[in-house]
Amino acid sequence: MSIDPQTIRQLLLQLGDTVRDKVAQARLAVSSDDESLATISRESVADTIYGIDRISEEAIESWFAEYWPQEIPIELVMEGVEPDKPVTIPHGTPLGQTLYKCILDPIDGTRAIMYDKRSAWFLAGLASQKGADTRLSDIEVAVMVELPTTKQWRADRVAAIRGQGAVVDSVNVLTWEQKPILLRPSRATDALHGFAYISRFFPTGKSIIATIEQELWETLYPSEGGRDSIIFEDQYISTGGQFYEVLTGHDRMIADIRPLVFAKLGLNSALCCHPYDVCSSLILMELGVVVEHPLGGPLNGPLDTTSPISWVAYANEKLAASICP
């Protein structure tokens, strides 16, 4: 059965809008000193689930029940769904009868948005169902929807269909007016006097990652005449947010090598990226950004909630050629 990808794109954007609005309502409903949204709700095999995550999970469950077309049976893979308990839509559909696998990160950037510090992102991708063999490279439609802080009036949305480019717009969350916007990744061919960095959000492995980054920049851009090379960083604790910063031209290169570092240290830590964190990477590629494994080769993990993912995004091909190993 062939499904119009434009229909899928609109459905996933609608779902992202629903999550955005529910999260905004929840933030407005609590006082500034109420930390219930930042309270740990439970621990999953993939991540820590906070109070604010429960709001998005409930919104997603009700949205799928009401709006997802019954003739498009899917397997739903998302943060909070245990690997041994697959969820299908419509509920009760045998896994073998699903046509697609839909992978979601309802709130990518929970730790920032739950303190009203910085935007989080709703991320989604849909791929033809291949069971355990379904991979990131199979994603045909991907969307990102910004979940803004309470002081923001604008929230952006990006959606891509493989081979058809991307559609970008902004939503005025006060009036609901939508306007198309243009995203243009940086055309810079080096990182000097721009934002470029390797992610190191948590204490584990931080010193090693910092050393690797320092050695990278010193190798590429040696100090001359006693003057240090100038490169900025912005540790945006949201993979979707990092992707967006590259898409807008704000950041030139971002890498996340935590799984590689943890493996070197002999650590089994869930504090790293998983496939749902990078499920919108198709959008970057459709807009000319180079997204790949940090050691080279395609970014291509299974569509599950537990596999560790290392990635790097370069704003353009010339920049990638000048930096990648």
Task: Label each region the model flagged.
Residues 54-59, 70-76, 122, 241-257:
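Conserved long hydrophobic alpha-helices within structured protein cores
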Residues 60, 64, 122, 126, ...:
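Buried hydrophobic packing segments
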Residues 9, 47-55, 114-117, 237-240, ...:
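Short, conserved micro-motifs enriched in small and acidic residues
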Residues 95-163:
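DPxDG-like acidic metal-binding loop motif
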Residues 44-49, 108-112, 229-233, 269-270:
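A short glycine/serine-rich beta->alpha loop
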Residues 1-107, 318-319, 324:
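N-terminal subdomain of lithium-sensitive/metallo-dependent phosphomonoesterases centered on the IMPase/IPPase/PAP
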Residues 29-31, 65-73, 128-134, 149-150, ...:
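Alpha-helix termini
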Residues 12, 16-19, 23, 27, ...:
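An extended, acidic
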